[in-house]
Amino acid sequence: MEQILKFLWYISTIILVFSILIHNPKSEGLGTIGSQNQFFSNTRSTENTLNKVTWLFLALFLLFTTILAIN
């Protein structure tokens, strides 16, 4: 059982790291004066989905970490 949990922990860790790395940085400030604005709802929808996936795998990572630490 512990091997299955460790495998799921590794998978959730890898997906969490990749989902964090593919996030677009929220550039706010003086550097964005001449940059393009995002008016497309498709971009916002993708960003919202990516945020949900990131939070889901963060929760799974913390859950598996806690369970494995108790064992």
Curated annotation (Swiss-Prot):
UniProt GO molecular function: protein-transporting ATPase activity
Top-level taxonomic group: Eukaryota
A GO-annotated cellular component: chloroplast thylakoid membrane
Location of this chain's protein in the cell: Plastid, Chloroplast thylakoid membrane
Record carries keyword Thylakoid: yes
GO biological process: protein secretion
Annotated membrane topology: Multi-pass membrane protein
Transmembrane segments: 4-24, 50-70
Chief location category: plastid
Function: Involved in protein export. Participates in an early event of protein translocation across the chloroplast thylakoid membrane (Potential).
Membership in a protein family: Belongs to the SecG family.
Name of the protein: Probable protein-export membrane protein secG
Organism classification: Eukaryota, Rhodophyta, Bangiophyceae, Bangiales, Bangiaceae
